[in-house]
C-alpha cells in the first residue's frame, strides 16, 4: 500500500510504503532493459519539471521516467522564466496550477520550498531536492541499489562519508535506512558534521579508518562548496589524504562491501578514480540505472492516488 499524496520527503513514508515503491521499481528495471521501453501508466497526464538548481542526473532521469510512462513532459527553463523577473514561488505555483498539470517535479535551493509549493497546487508534487533538507528519490534509488546488491535492506552496516552537514542525500538516506533497521555511521571531519548529529541514533567517526571497519555499504559524498560559507577543510589534498576513499581505506570494510556515490563525483577528492570504476565494488552506475526505475515507480504510484482522489471528488459532485 502506498497512500502518499506527494513525495516531499522520506520522513512521512512508512516502511511498507517504501517496500511497495521499491517492488514496483523492480518491474520498471525490467521494462527499461527491453527494446521497447514504454508504459501507459501516465498516458494523458502532464508532468512539469521545475529545476531552480542545475542538475544533470536528476532532471534527465525524471524526464526519461515521465516519457517512458507515456506522460507529456515539459521542462521549464527557470533561467529565462518569470522567476528571474521577480515572480515569487507561490505566484509561479498558482500560474502553473491554472494550467492543470498532473505532476510537478521541483528542485529548489531553499529547504522547505517544495513543501510550500505543494500546498498551493492541486496536482502531485515530487521533491527533486530542496536545500539541505531532503532528496527522497535519491534515497529510494540508493535503497533499491543496496537491496539488489546485498539481497536485503535491513541489518546492514552503512557508512556515509564526507560532507554530511550540507547533504540532503545524507539526511534522506539516514531516515530511510534508519526506518529499515540498519546500523548507521557518519564519517568525516567535525566541521562537516551537522549540529545535533549525535542525537540521530547513529555512530559518529572522525577517523575514516575506524568508520569503515566492517562496513557493508560505503556511501561517499562530495564537498558541496556551493553551500559552504567558510573554510570547512584545510585543503582538498589534505581532505583526500584523511577522508578520500582509496584502496587502503576500503580494505577495512567488509570483503564484499559496495561503494556508492550520488554524483557528481570529484575524483581525487572524496574518491579515488580506480575505486569509482571498480566493477567488483562500485555500484555507482547501477545507482544511475535505478534512478530512472525508482522515479517511474514514484510517479506511477502518485498518479494512481491522484486519479483515485479525482474520481472520488467527481462521484461526490454527481451524488
From Swiss-Prot:
Enzyme Commission number: 2.1.3.2
UniProt-listed GO biological process terms: 'de novo' pyrimidine nucleobase biosynthetic process; 'de novo' UMP biosynthetic process; amino acid metabolic process
Gene: pyrB
Chain positions recorded as carbamoyl phosphate binding sites: 57-58, 107, 135, 138, 263-264
Species assigned in the record: Paracoccus denitrificans (strain Pd 1222)
UniProt cross-references to SUPFAM superfamilies, sorted A to Z: Aspartate/ornithine carbamoyltransferase (SSF53671)
Protein function: Catalyzes the condensation of carbamoyl phosphate and aspartate to form carbamoyl aspartate and inorganic phosphate, the committed step in the de novo pyrimidine nucleotide biosynthesis pathway.
Name the record gives this protein: Aspartate carbamoyltransferase catalytic subunit
Positions bound to L-aspartate: 85, 168, 222
Record's subunit section: Heterododecamer (2C3:3R2) of six catalytic PyrB chains organized as two trimers (C3), and six regulatory PyrI chains organized as three dimers (R2).
Family assignment from sequence similarity: Belongs to the aspartate/ornithine carbamoyltransferase superfamily. ATCase family.
A cellular component annotation (GO) from this entry: cytosol
Alphabetical UniProt keywords: Pyrimidine biosynthesis, Transferase
Keyword Transferase applies: yes
Amino acid at each position: 500500500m502506498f497512500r502518499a499524496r506527494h513525495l516531499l520527503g522520506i520522513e512521512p513514508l512508512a516502511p511498507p510504503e517504501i517496500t511497495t515503491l521499491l517492488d514496483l521499481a523492480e518491474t520498471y528495471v525490467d521494462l527499461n532493459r527491453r527494446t521497447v521501453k514504454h508504459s501507459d501508466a501516465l498516458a494523458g497526464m502532464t508532468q512539469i519539471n521545475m529545476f531552480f538548481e542545475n542538475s544533470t542526473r536528476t532532471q534527465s532521469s525524471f524526464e526519461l521516467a515521465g516519457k517512458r510512462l507515456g506522460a507529456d513532459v515539459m521542462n521549464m527553463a527557470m533561467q529565462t522564466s518569470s522567476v528571474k523577473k521577480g515572480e515569487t514561488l507561490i505566484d509561479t505555483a498558482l500560474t502553473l496550477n491554472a494550467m492543470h498539470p498532473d505532476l510537478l517535479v521541483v528542485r529548489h535551493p531553499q529547504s522547505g520550498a517544495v513543501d510550500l509549493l505543494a500546498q498551493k497546487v492541486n496536482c502531485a508534487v515530487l521533491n527533486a531536492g530542496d536545500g539541505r533538507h531532503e532528496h527522497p528519490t535519491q534515497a529510494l534509488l540508493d535503497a533499491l541499489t543496496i537491496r539488489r546488491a546485498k539481497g536485503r535492506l535491513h541489518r546492514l552496516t552503512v557508512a556515509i562519508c564526507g560532507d554530511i552537514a550540507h547533504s540532503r542525500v545524507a539526511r534522506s538516506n539516514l531516515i530511510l535506512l534508519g526506518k529499515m533497521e540498519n546500523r548507521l555511521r557518519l564519517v568525516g571531519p567535525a566541521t562537516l558534521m551537522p549540529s545535533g548529529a549525535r542525537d540521530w541514533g547513529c555512530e559518529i567517526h572522525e577517523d575514516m579508518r575506524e568508520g569503515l571497519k566492517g562496513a557493508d555499504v560505503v556511501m561517499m559524498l562530495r564537498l558541496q562548496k556551493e553551500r559552504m560559507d567558510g573554510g570547512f577543510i584545510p585543503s582538498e589534498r589534505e581532505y583526500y589524504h584523511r577522508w578520500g576513499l582509496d584502496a587502503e581505506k576500503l580494505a577495512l570494510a567488509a570483503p564484499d562491501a559496495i561503494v556508492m556515490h550520488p554524483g557528481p563525483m570529484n575524483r581525487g577528492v572524496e574518491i579515488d578514480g580506480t575505486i569509482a570504476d571498480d566493477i567488483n565494488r562500485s555500484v555507482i552506475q547501477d545507482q544511475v540505472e535505478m534512478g530512472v526505475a525508482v522515479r517511474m515507480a514514484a510517479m506511477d504510484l502518485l498518479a494512481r492516488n491522484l486519479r483515485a482522489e479525482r474520481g472520488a471528488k467527481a462521484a461526490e459532485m454527481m451524488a
